[in-house]
């Protein structure tokens, strides 16, 4: 009974963390003060998440490592690291939730590192969630055809998510190329959340297919069914996203500057005298 209760608590914490992550990535909707308090809430949930999963850390140096365990361990540790740095840098710029921690480190550096690590946390959180999906799908006991249809539909959705990821300029944050956050304050709040969900879905889909690929590598040859199918699905999702991006780019180029990321509908979050800094999302861990 206690085991079931612990599992339920873990699931609730996971769901709450995912919801808060989506809120943190919607800075233009929540505003600065609420963004900081949501970040504090996320920090508390992540600490609780580590406590609930403390046995995982106790077993990290025990047993053999198969491809799936290697992949999940790398993602989980990278996710925890990205969260710690995101939270630290966010608190170093805080003007509302924990203003007494302002200036713990250079604010200009903290701003760029916060953007950099928070977007990596978003990517890694998606992959972390996705790597647990095959287990949940297995419990649904779907027929092979049903599973294939579901995979194809999710592949299309993931492709749309990749398109939005590119359109919103996310890759620039991942490679430490963007010093300030470019946010569209004219976009409807519901659309911001929908885009965040779709972008997260892309990385969750990648995580799912990586997990399936790792598990396939552990099977005997006679047990494997379409072992390269996960690779095909990943490539298909990427191609769908790139094609939509190319088509969208061509259309917006003919649309007299409307749509996309134009200076007329995009605000650059700047900091004057480094007294106010951009805060974009605190997140996550295993």
Model features per residue range: what roles?
Residues 1-286:
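Membrane-embedded alpha-helical bundles that constitute the cytochrome b-like, heme-associated redox core
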């Amino acid at each position: 009974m206690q085991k079931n209760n612990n599992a339920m608590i873990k699931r609730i914490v996971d769901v709450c963390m995912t919801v808060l992550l989506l809120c943190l990535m919607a800075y233009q909707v929540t505003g600065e003060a609420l963004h900081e308090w949501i970040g504090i809430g996320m920090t508390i949930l992540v600490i609780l998440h580590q406590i609930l999963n403390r046995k995982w850390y106790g077993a990290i140096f025990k047993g053999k490592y198969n491809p799936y365990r290697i992949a999940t361990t790398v993602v989980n540790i990278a996710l925890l690291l990205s969260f710690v740095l995101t939270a630290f840098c966010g608190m170093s710029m805080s003007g509302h939730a924990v203003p007494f921690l302002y200036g713990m480190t250079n604010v200009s550096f903290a701003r760029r590192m916060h953007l950099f690590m928070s977007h990596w946390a978003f990517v890694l959180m998606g992959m972390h969630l996705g790597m647990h999906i095959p287990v949940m799908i297995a419990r649904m006991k779907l027929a092979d055809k049903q599973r294939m249809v579901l995979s194809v539909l999710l592949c299309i959705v993931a492709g749309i998510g990749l398109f939005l990821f590119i359109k919103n300029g996310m890759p620039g944050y991942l490679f430490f190329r963007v010093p300030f956050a470019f946010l569209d304050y004219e976009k409807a709040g519901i659309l911001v959340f929908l885009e965040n969900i779709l972008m997260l879905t892309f990385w969750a889909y990648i995580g799912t297919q990586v997990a399936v690929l790792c598990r396939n590598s552990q099977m005997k040859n006679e047990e494997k069914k379409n072992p390269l199918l996960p690779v095909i699905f990943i490539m298909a999702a990427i191609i769908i996203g790139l094609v939509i991006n190319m088509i969208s780019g061509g259309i917006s180029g003919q649309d007299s500057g409307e749509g996309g990321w134009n200076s007329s509908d995009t605000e650059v979050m700047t900091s004057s005298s480094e007294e106010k800094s951009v805060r974009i999302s605190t997140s996550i861990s295993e």
